[in-house]
A protein has these predicted regions:
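C-terminal SET catalytic tail plus cysteine-rich post-SET Zn-binding segment of SAM-dependent SET-domain
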Residues: 90-181
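Catalytic cores of histone-lysine modification enzymes
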Residues: 2-97
């Protein structure tokens, strides 16, 4: 199995502060160019069953889905969860370079919030954001679910920049051969 950073790495040009979207978000202290790494998610790889047990114990945590039935979960004992996290936007300023690396989708200006569309790494059909989206984008979906990656508008917006396992699923969908893994 691939190894991941024990903790999330965040570009030093990023700072955590209050966000109009939700809680504390990640903001550019200095400009960040399109394609530059914003953060690399670290943590513990967990199966669906392990992740379900984890969710039953912890309410506040950061996690991303990295493959079918596999999640990368920051250890709440060592994470900066209270500091903040990357907020969702339906027109995100970052996208996936691989299953754990978020890069700038476009140039980020000083003071701009770095955001990610959770559809880029979430496929759990039973998952839904615990509040209505407040991203303010003209593309706002309002209700954010684990099935949003299947929407054609979302697939077009982020073409080939989802987590690799979702890119593979989308390719299978386009070929008409997706079977739930």
């Amino acid at each position: 199995m691939k190894t991941y950073l024990p903790q999330t790495w965040t570009d030093p040009r990023i700072e955590f502060r209050e966000s109009p979207i939700s809680g504390n978000g990640m903001f550019a202290r200095e400009p960040i160019k399109k394609g530059e790494s914003v953060c690399v998610v670290g943590g513990i790889a967990m199966t669906d069953a392990e992740f379900a047990d984890f969710q039953a114990t912890y309410r506040n945590y950061n996690a991303i889905q990295i493959d079918d039935h596999l999640h990368l979960v920051e250890d709440p004992q060592v994470t900066r969860i209270l500091e903040g996290s990357m907020n969702h936007s339906c027109d995100s300023s970052t996208w996936m370079a691989d299953e754990a690396t978020l890069v700038a989708r476009r140039d980020l200006e000083r003071g701009e919030e770095a955001t990610v569309d959770y559809a880029l790494f979430t496929t759990q059909s039973n998952w839904m954001l615990d509040r209505r989206c407040r991203c303010g984008s003209p593309h706002c979906r309002r209700i954010i679910t684990g099935d949003d990656w299947m929407r054609e508008d979302v697939q077009e917006r982020y073409r080939d920049h989802f987590s690799p396992f979702i890119n593979r699923r989308i390719e299978k969908l386009r070929k008409g051969s997706l079977h739930d893994s």
